[in-house]
Amino acid sequence: DELEKQTGQPLEEVCIAAAGRVLKTVTTHVEYEYAQESVVTGEDVHTLDLLGIEKAQEAFKEVNDTSYKFYCVGYSTVKFFLNDEVFISLEGHKANKIGEDIIVTFLPEDVVDGLYAAVGQAGLSVANMTLEPIAAINVAIPENYRMLNIALVDVGAGTSDISITRDGSIIAYGMIPH
């Protein structure tokens, strides 16, 4: 109520950043080959992301040694590839084949459901969910500084979040419980 009064705007949706001691990540590579040379669109890049997430989910199912059901809660593209060459961005370029290295993150169903329940109890709904290490690095380290090899450690009350950059990309992230 106080935020609504201060801003003069009703709050209905929130974006949340999840922490989790049981965070699991999978890094994978995915490619898509066009029938003929094409200009890469934003939709093509989004499709590539979805293919990467799907491939990571399949890989995670094979190694998941718990009885927990996990949800994909975030992902980051490490590198894009255009005709097997590393590119910063794919959109607008002509290509026969596109690809990406992608990090996909999973949290147990009960953690995700608990976050959604807490937001619901506040009379709000979730508009977007990410992970604390992804949110922290996006706020603290602009993309042009990610060419440096940087490790960002966000020390919190329950977990410390770690994000690592190299060659312009987030190459790893995770959480360490206290």
Named regions from a protein language model:
Residues 25-27, 163, 174:
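Amphipathic coiled-coil signal-relay and dimerization helices
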Residues 1-14, 18-151, 169-170:
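Nucleotide/phosphate-binding catalytic cleft detector across ATP-hydrolyzing
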Residues 18-21, 152-159, 165-168, 176-178:
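A short acidic Gly-Thr/Ser loop motif
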